[in-house]
């Protein structure tokens, strides 16, 4: 708030964009920097044009994923569930995806290989694991 009320005539903002694997923790304690993770929909008004910068970064990520869909799989664990992949799509595109249609879409992706292994120790029905096959992806995408 204080930054928004100041009478600064020029501000230069440098923004860095980084995508982080879902299952990885950051190496430093965010509390040391008074920083914390916030869901996109929960971001409040930021100083200067920082909300616009975040919106433009999200547009860039969406365009990048459209051109290079394999980038999504770099953000997932080596073996992942359909639910994890669907959640990632929903986060990036900001809207819910129909579960049945998404499973059909996965079935058509030759490079998303179903594994025999299923989740263990979960309270719900165990989900099948999948893996991304980069070789098949490269062959299919040519």
Q: Which residues fall in each region the model found?
A:
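Short secondary-structure boundary micro-motifs
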Residues: 2-3, 62-63, 113-115
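NUDIX/MutT-family hydrolases
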Residues: 11-22, 26-63, 75-83, 102-110
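Generic detector of short, locally flexible boundary/turn motifs and exposed helical patches
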Residues: 2, 39-42, 50-52, 68, ...
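Core RNA-modification/binding signature centered on pseudouridine synthases
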Residues: 67-142
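Acidic pyrophosphate-coordinating catalytic loop
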Residues: 1-11
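Short helix-to-loop capping/linker segments positioned immediately adjacent to catalytic or ligand/cofactor-binding
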Residues: 3-5, 24-26, 68-76
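Alpha-helix initiation/capping motif
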Residues: 5, 43-46, 119
């Amino acid at each position: 708030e204080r930054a928004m009320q100041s009478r600064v005539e020029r501000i230069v903002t440098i923004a860095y964009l980084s995508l982080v694997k879902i299952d990885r923790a950051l190496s430093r304690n965010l509390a040391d920097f008074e920083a914390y993770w916030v869901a996109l929909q929960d971001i409040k008004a930021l100083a200067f044009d920082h909300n616009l910068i975040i919106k433009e970064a999200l547009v860039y990520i969406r365009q990048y994923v459209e051109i290079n869909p394999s980038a999504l799989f770099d953000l997932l664990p080596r073996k992942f569930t359909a639910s994890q992949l669907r959640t990632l799509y929903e986060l990036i595109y900001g809207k819910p995806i129909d579960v049945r249609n998404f499973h059909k879409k996965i079935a058509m992706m030759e490079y998303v290989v179903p594994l025999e292994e299923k989740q263990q120790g979960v309270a719900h029905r165990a989900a099948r694991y999948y893996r991304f096959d980069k070789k098949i992806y490269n062959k299919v995408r040519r």
